[in-house]
Every structure is written in structure tokens, then in C-alpha cells.
Swiss-Prot record:
Zinc-finger recorded as keyword: yes
Effect of mutating residue 184 to A: Dominant negative mutant; can prevent Wallerian degeneration when overexpressed
Native source organism of the sequence: Mus musculus
Catalytic activity, as annotated: S-ubiquitinyl-[E2 ubiquitin-conjugating enzyme]-L-cysteine + [acceptor protein]-L-lysine = [E2 ubiquitin-conjugating enzyme]-L-cysteine + N(6)-ubiquitinyl-[acceptor protein]-L-lysine
Lineage of the organism: Eukaryota, Metazoa, Chordata, Craniata, Vertebrata
Annotated protein name in UniProt: E3 ubiquitin-protein ligase ZNRF1
Post-translational modification: N-myristoylation targets ZNRF1 to intracellular membranes.
Domain of life where this protein originates: Eukaryota
Gene: Znrf1
């Protein structure tokens, strides 16, 4: 009490609430250091931690390890509670926090021991994989209806679904083939004489069992989906 503080001890860091002392003065040739802040309550229970993890907020990125943003949760590390982070004075052997290694250059994040650093190109667009936005989300290309297989513009999508789902199923007439009639396009087997067929209003014919299965998930002719 009453003692005269040194000039270095009275120097203030760039952050409010940061108290500095002689230990906050960076050693010759050492990395920049912002001092310490106190997290405890009483005089005997005060603990100081390094706040150099906020490098990039008031510090030249070239000296802060190039980290544009950081989210830091203090965690105790051995004697002295010293922390190693980009821009801090940590050991050079910990390459995780060294320049260029504390975050993913491709825009991802790196999380370790409560620390999260976002890369210089981190953005929502970079984080999302391309397959999450299919081509049919575009208002120009529209999408293909899974019911009738028609291409529909995105602004007409809701109305089309309502009409497509409420459209009555096609009716057909049963018949028995009197002669061979080529291939059934559903099962790709031949329509032979004596087979029971279904004749649709468009005059297309199929095996009755095939068209019944088709109409369980579709409401139009396999060869005339627009009808």
C-alpha cells in the first residue's frame, strides 16, 4: 500500500478491466501480451489468467497469428495458470496454437480445451456442403414432381402438389388379350395372348397387376404423365 508503481505496471492494455503488472511486460523479442485479468473474489483467492487469447480484437492480425475471431473459455493449465493461444507467449512446441494451425484455413473451426477459432474464410456459405442445396431449390430451374414427373416452377410448387395429390386416379377397363401385344413398359415383360390387361383411357395397355402396383404411388399413365 502506498508503494509507487513502476511505469510498466501503470501501463494499460487495450481492454477495459484488464489490470497489468510487471509480469505483463513482454520479454525482449517475445510475443505481444495484454496482461492479466482477475476472475476470483477475495484478496487471497484472486487468480489471474492470460487474455492474449483475444488476439485479433484490437491487434494487428499479422501479430495475432492471423486469427480474425476467437471464442475462448479459460481453463487451468498447471502451475501459474498460463495459457497458450494464438498471439500469446506459449511454448513453440504446441503447434496447435501456432500461427496457421489454430484454425482451418478452408473456413472450418478448430476446437480444443474450450477454445474455438474460426478461419479467415469461415462463413455459412463455406460451411454448408453443396449437396444441401439441390438444383431444384432454384427459382429458375424448378423441380421435378415425384408424383407426375412434371417439371414445376418453385413458386407454383404448393399449388401443384395440392392439385396433383387431389387428382383422381385413372380408371381402366379389364380385358383379356386375344393376341400378343408387345412389351409392358412397367415390368418389361411381354404381353402375351391370354394375359389379363388393363386398358387406360389413353388406350395404353399393361398387365393388370402391374398397373395396380403403379397406381399405388402414381396417378397418371406411365407413358403419358402430363395427362
Amino acid at each position: 500500500m502506498g508503494g509507487k508503481q513502476s511505469t510498466a505496471a501503470r501501463s494499460r492494455g487495450p481492454f477495459p478491466g484488464v489490470s497489468t503488472d510487471d509480469s505483463a511486460v513482454p520479454p525482449p523479442g517475445g510475443a505481444p501480451h495484454f496482461g492479466h485479468y482477475r476472475t476470483g473474489g477475495g484478496a487471497m483467492g484472486l487468480r489471474s489468467r492470460s487474455v492474449s487469447s483475444v488476439a485479433g480484437m484490437g491487434m494487428d492480425p499479422s501479430t495475432a497469428g492471423g486469427v480474425p475471431f476467437s471464442l475462448y473459455t479459460p481453463a487451468s493449465r498447471g502451475t501459474g495458470d498460463s495459457e497458450r493461444a494464438p498471439g500469446g507467449g506459449g511454448s513453440t512446441s504446441d503447434s496447435t496454437y501456432a500461427h496457421g494451425n489454430g484454425y482451418q484455413e478452408t473456413g472450418g473451426g478448430h476446437h480444443r480445451d474450450g477454445m474455438l477459432y474460426l478461419g479467415s474464410r469461415a462463413s455459412l456459405a463455406d460451411a454448408l456442403p453443396l449437396h444441401i442445396a439441390p438444383r431444384w431449390f432454384s427459382s429458375h430451374s424448378g423441380f421435378k414432381c415425384p408424383i407426375c414427373s412434371k417439371s414445376v416452377a418453385s413458386d407454383e410448387m404448393e399449388m401443384h402438389f395440392i392439385m396433383c395429390l387431389s387428382k383422381p386416379r385413372l380408371s381402366y377397363n379389364d380385358d383379356v388379350l386375344t393376341k400378343d401385344a408387345g412389351e409392358c413398359v412397367i415390368c418389361l415383360e411381354e404381353l402375351l395372348q391370354g394375359d389379363t390387361i388393363a386398358r387406360l383411357p389413353c388406350l395404353c395397355i399393361y398387365h393388370k397387376s402391374c398397373i395396380d402396383s403403379w397406381f399405388e404411388v402414381n396417378r397418371s399413365c406411365p407413358e403419358h404423365p402430363a395427362d
